[in-house]
């Protein structure tokens, strides 16, 4: 099973500077839909090409990112290409 990198304000620059595709899931431990879909996201991540960065953000630990990317519903999956948000 693929390990999902936990991102926060300190290391999210890795996503913003990556020259490929990144898929990032924003969620929270208190969110029932987040918990219910966590395994499905892990299985999805396992099927992606290894050149695609995959990670997760706990919104409670990353309020600046949550605001910056306008995360209003959980879970939210954002797709970045060369550091730019292209799809949510």
Task: Please give the residue ranges for each predicted region.
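Residue-level detector of structured alpha->beta connecting loops
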Residues: 19-20, 49, 70
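Thiol-based oxidoreductase modules, predominantly thioredoxin-like and allied folds used
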Residues: 4-8, 26, 38-64, 74, ...
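N-terminal leader/targeting and pre-domain segments
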Residues: 1-22
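Short pre-active-site segment immediately N-terminal to redox-active cysteine/selenocysteine motifs
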Residues: 20, 27-30, 73
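Nucleotide phosphate-binding site architecture
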Residues: 13, 32, 42, 86
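Short, thiol/selenol-centered motifs that function as redox-active sites or metal-ligating centers
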Residues: 30-38
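Conserved SAM-binding loop
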Residues: 23, 33, 54
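Thiol/disulfide oxidoreductase modules built on the thioredoxin-like
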Residues: 66-74, 84-88
């Amino acid at each position: 099973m693929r390990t999902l990198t936990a991102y926060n304000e300190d290391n999210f620059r890795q996503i913003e500077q990556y020259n490929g595709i990144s898929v990032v899931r924003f969620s929270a431990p208190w969110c029932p839909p987040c918990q219910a879909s966590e395994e499905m996201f892990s299985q999805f991540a396992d099927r992606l090409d290894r050149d695609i960065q995959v990670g997760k953000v706990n919104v409670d630990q990353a309020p600046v990112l949550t605001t910056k990317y306008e995360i209003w519903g959980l879970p939210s999956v954002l797709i970045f290409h060369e550091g730019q948000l292209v799809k949510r």
